[in-house]
From Swiss-Prot:
PANTHER family reported for this sequence: COMPLEMENT COMPONENT C6
Activation and inhibition: Membrane attack complex (MAC) assembly is inhibited by CD59, thereby protecting self-cells from damage during complement activation. MAC assembly is also inhibited by clusterin (CLU) chaperones that inhibit polymerization of C9.
N-terminal signal peptide: 1-21
Subunit details: Component of the membrane attack complex (MAC), composed of complement C5b, C6, C7, C8A, C8B, C8G and multiple copies of the pore-forming subunit C9.
Post-translational modification: All cysteine residues are assumed to be cross-linked to one another. Individual modules containing an even number of conserved cysteine residues are supposed to have disulfide linkages only within the same module.
Source species taxonomy: Eukaryota, Metazoa, Chordata, Craniata, Vertebrata
Pfam families: EGF_C8A_B_C6 (PF21195), Kazal_C6 (PF21288), Ldl_recept_a (PF00057), MACPF (PF01823), Sushi (PF00084), TSP_1 (PF00090)
Protein name from the UniProt record: Complement component C6
Cellular compartments annotated: Secreted; Target cell membrane
Ranges where the Sushi domain occurs: 642-701, 702-763
Organism for this UniProt entry: Bos taurus (Bovine)
InterPro entries reported in the protein's UniProt record: C6_KAZAL, C8A_B_C6_EGF-like, FacI_MAC, Kazal_dom, LDL_receptor-like_sf, LDLR_class-A_CS, LDrepeatLR_classA_rpt, MAC_perforin
Length: 932
């Protein structure tokens, strides 16, 4: 049949010669229809304007011509406009600034080219307060008080230096004493060391430290580049100009996409005191040791460049240091402008006013670092051209490094590799691999901005001249930046000002809310598993390797994956403070959830933190300064000639009707805290001699408090309190296991076994080793062999109590070792119970059970254990469960004469009944084997 079809086709082709073939363009196309969608990929169609004439039939146009075509249109993602919420209610009138405020939040950032939000998020109006302003001035004691409220040492008054910052210490002076015998210039760029740093935006902000303050000490440091020494400010612990920069320490990195350049900063990275949720901040590291140095505008430029075509990136960077510095750890002098901003903060918490501190002065300050510059360029290459060049990733980045050294850094001994000039990409540009890039993006830090910008270039433009690098390098000495720095939270500086503790706590609370504005959980899903990044009020998409487009909606021909990577949704609100003074919040991996083999979300799903709550009447925020013990206490005790003072409750108890004085004959009731119960007579009576008549009463624990588990572990079931006998289990993310016991039981006053602080998650080596084999075995190729107890059981596995029947000794072993020994047919080791061996009823029954097992006709493997005649294996727990004596089959060969309890008569039982009775912990003595 197939042969006849081929012959028919050949004959048909022969009949249709060139003169008879249909010229399809004889029938023109109609206009393209309008797109079915305005965005998010629609379709449009067009049809041929066919006329069924003689030409149409004679030339087989119906068979040869395409009558309709369709194409994709408006593939760009639909824009999302930024949307603001309504203003909330007016706040209470702040008694210190005499204003009230109302705020609103961004409900949705703009994305995919939507309209941005430009309206303010806060408004205020004057008001008449109903509370008193409780800000108190700091007592300077024997120090000099500046007009700004700052306290400085008395010896600094009238020394010819502006130590107050407002010059109030130099007024009305007679004779002035000098500190230094001659004048000294400040260290170049010393003000930069005192700038705040906005960790979330990745840029310096306002001055927080006054590095012009010298503290009345003439301390100087010399530089080899200057003849006169520089004056060292009081805030600096150490400064060193003798910094060596190697000629050839140029580093190169290759990136398939920009996602590795986007750094995920967690709580620890933010520093103690400013803990918040995990969120992504675009960071470009200035060197290996650098904490961070970011350029959000440069990052945005790189994202936009990558969206135009499928790209790879090569980054070239070199650090040039002028000096190193270290700040003091305490007694830092704040800048006058920062001090004034702190002093103007209200005592009553106001999110908008406190958040302005972070906008103006950043979130952190520099504790150490270097002044200098970073030569840092990001070269964008077409992924297709780079692939066609024939170079590997390692060869490509090496070629850029070599050409940079030769062209800009003037390194004398630079060997040019043959592959760098003769590959297909370099040959298009006269042997220059660098000019084969689409563009380079300047991430340069330090130096004059004009020189830094001139180091970048774009295809089609002239390559930067050789002197551009030397001009920039020379300008770094006069215009350095802070690089290779370490940070500390700005809240650490809020000390020795009025109400420092109150304001410090308010700032920490404000930061938690402020940081949420940078969390990309608010962004919509990016196409093709693009990574969303929140930049201001706009969401951007960082494209995966092999995707491009304004929103990563386009794919390279070789990108075939349909996997959707998971991304975190936003954190829930914090729960209320519970009885353990802890609160928690959660988030879900549903923005989107991983699909079709996509990556799971990285990071923790649940967070916990310490919390407090107040039982005092709210008369306004108290002013708490450093070194003050402000506690919730009652009024001072009043003198009384009759009645009883407040009695002392038992440990873990309190008095229901608590007060300072009680009348004669009055009773008080003793209650216990949550998790405890009162045992004894709970009432005390006040006697005429001002003593209390009270019986024995104590608060005994009935429940266990929720334990604090190390970070990374998940506790289940999650409850505030657990009853005695309840168990909890600790688990790790998929592929990891707990490096210690995972199951714990509430035993009254503590958890058994004790929960160690050193618990963590580690790679699940044993499961990987076991493969598809039975417990105690490992997979070698396609075969299953017994594990070696010595070589394969080095990682943690559950502790169990084991009896060696040869020596009659019992000891604690790992489950891995027991299973491996059983696989090797070691008959002398027997499972006793889960957990370490400890004297008690559990161990006693375990040993007796093993003795009885010698008479058992049933030996059923069950988890670590072997079940005998009087037991069955639980399918859910893989543990042996005792039968009831009535469930045992009567008769059999294994019979015993036993005496139960105080009965004088013997009774005949089989092995199942004997084991069941003993398992039920009933008193029994085996008189002899056989019938009575």
């Amino acid at each position: 049949m197939a042969r006849h079809s081929v012959m028919y086709f050949i004959l048909l082709s022969a009949l249709i010669d060139k003169s008879q073939a249909c010229f399809c363009d004889h029938y023109p196309w109609s206009q393209w229809s309008s797109c079915s969608k305005t965005c998010n990929s629609g379709t449009q169609t067009r049809q041929r304007r066919i006329v069924t004439d003689k030409y149409y039939f004679e030339n087989f146009c119906g068979q040869l011509c395409t009558k309709q075509e369709s194409r994709e249109c408006n593939w760009q993602t639909c824009p999302i406009n930024c949307r603001l919420g309504d203003y909330g209610p007016w706040s209470d009138c702040d008694p210190c600034v005499q204003k009230r405020f109302k705020v609103r939040s961004i409900l949705r950032p703009s994305q995919f080219g939507g309209q941005p939000c430009t309206e303010p998020l806060m408004t205020f109006q004057p008001c008449i307060p109903s509370k008193l302003c409780k800000i108190e001035e700091i007592d300077c004691k024997n120090k000099f008080r500046c007009d700004s409220g700052r306290c400085i040492a008395s010896k600094l008054e009238c020394n010819g230096e502006n130590d107050c910052g407002d010059n109030s210490d130099e007024r009305n002076c007679g004779r002035k004493k000098t500190v230094c015998s001659r004048s000294h210039n400040p260290i170049p760029g010393v003000q930069l060391m005192g700038m705040g740093f906005h960790f979330l935006a990745g840029e310096p902000r306002g001055e927080v430290l006054d590095n012009s303050f010298t503290g009345g000490v003439c301390r100087t440091v010399k530089s080899s580049r200057a003849s006169n020494p520089y004056r060292v400010p009081a805030n600096l612990e150490n400064v060193n100009f003798e910094v060596q920069t190697k000629e050839d320490d140029l580093e190169a990195d290759f990136y398939d996409d920009l996602i590795p350049l986007e750094d995920n900063k967690d709580q620890e990275a933010l520093g103690s005191g400013l803990a918040t949720s995990s969120f992504r901040v675009p960071i470009f590291y200035s060197s290996k040791r650098s904490q961070s140095s970011s350029h959000s505008s440069a990052f945005k430029q790189a994202i936009q460049a990558s969206q135009k075509k499928a790209s790879s990136f090569i980054r070239i960077h070199k650090v040039i240091k002028v000096l190193n510095f270290t700040m003091k750890t305490k007694d830092l002098q704040l800048s006058d402008v920062f001090l004034k901003a702190l002093n103007h903060l209200p005592l009553e918490y106001n999110s908008a006013l406190y958040s302005r501190i972070f906008d103006d002065f950043g979130t952190h300050y520099f504790t150490s670092g270097s002044l200098g510059g970073v030569y840092d360029l990001l070269y964008q290459f077409s992924k297709e051209e780079l692939k066609n060049s024939g170079l590997t990733q390692e060869e490509a980045k090496n070629c850029i490094r070599i050409e940079t050294k030769k062209r800009f850094l003037f390194v004398k001994k630079t060997k040019v590799e043959h592959r760098c000039t003769t590959n297909k990409l370099s040959e298009k540009y006269e042997g220059s691999f660098m000019q084969g890039s689409e563009k380079s993006i300047s991430l340069v830090q330090g130096g004059r901005s004009a020189y830094a910008a001139a180091l970048a270039w774009e295809k089609g433009s002239p390559v930067p001249e050789e002197r551009v690098f030397s001009d920039w390098l020379e300008s770094v000495k006069e215009n350095p930046s802070v690089i290779d720095f370490a940070l500390a939270p700005i809240t650490d500086l809020v000390r020795n000002i009025p109400c420092a503790v109150t304001r410090r706590n308010n700032l920490r609370r404000a930061f938690r809310e402020y940081a949420a504005k940078f969390d990309p959980c608010q962004c919509a899903r990016c196409p093709n598993s693009g990574r969303p990044v929140l930049s201001g009020t706009e969401c951007l998409c960082v494209c995966q390797s092999g995707t491009y487009g304004e929103n990563c909606e386009r794919r390279s021909p070789d990108y075939k994956s349909n996997a959707v990577d998971g991304n975190w949704g936003c954190w829930s609100s914090w729960s209320s403070c519970d009885a353990t003074y802890r609160r928690s919040r959660t988030r879900e991996c549903n923005n989107p959830a991983p699909q079709q083999g996509g990556k799971r979300c990285e990071g923790e799903r649940r967070q916990e933190e310490h919390c407090t709550f107040s039982i005092m009447q709210n008369d306004g925020q108290p002013c708490i300064s450093d070194d003050e013990d402000m506690k919730e206490t009652d009024l001072p005790e009043l003198e009384s000639d009759s009645g009883c003072p407040q009695p002392v409750p038992p440990e873990n108890g309190f008095i229901r009707n608590e007060k300072k004085q009680y009348s004669v004959g009055e009773e008080v009731e003793i209650l216990c805290f949550t998790g405890f119960k009162a045992v004894g007579y709970q009432y005390f009576r006040c006697l005429p001699d001002r003593s209390w008549r009270q019986g024995d009463v104590e608060c005994q624990r009935t429940e266990c408090l929720k334990p604090i588990v190390p970070e990374g572990l998940t506790l289940s079931p999650f409850q505030t309190l657990y009853k005695i006998g309840d168990s909890i289990e600790l688990t790790c993310p998929r592929g990891l296991v707990v490096n210690g016991p995972s199951r714990y039981t509430c035993s009254g006053d503590s958890w058994t076994p004790p929960i160690s602080d050193s618990l963590s998650c580690e790679k699940d080596v044993l499961t990987g080793l076991r493969g598809h084999c039975q417990p105690g075995q490992k997979q070698l190729g396609s075969e299953c062999v017994c594990m070696s107890p010595e070589e394969d059981c080095g990682h943690y596995s559950e502790e169990i109590c084991v009896l060696d029947t040869t020596s009659s000794d019992y000891f604690t072993s790992s489950a891995c070792k027991l299973l491996a020994e059983k696989c090797l047919n070691n008959q002398q080791l027997h499972f006793v119970h889960i957990g370490s061996c400890e004297e008690g009823p559990q161990l006693k029954w375990g040993l007796e059970r093993i003795k009885l097992s010698s008479s058992s006709t049933k030996n059923e493997s069950c988890g670590y254990d072997t079940c005998y005649n009087w037991e069955k294996c639980s399918a859910t727990t893989s543990k042996c469960v005792c039968l009831l004596p009535s469930q045992c089959t009567k008769g059999g060969d294994q019979l015993f004469c036993v005496q139960i309890g105080s009965s004088a008569n013997g009774k005949t039982m089989n092995i199942c009944e004997v084991g069941a009775v003993k398992c039920a912990k009933r008193e029994m003595e085996i008189l002899h084997s056989g019938r009575c």
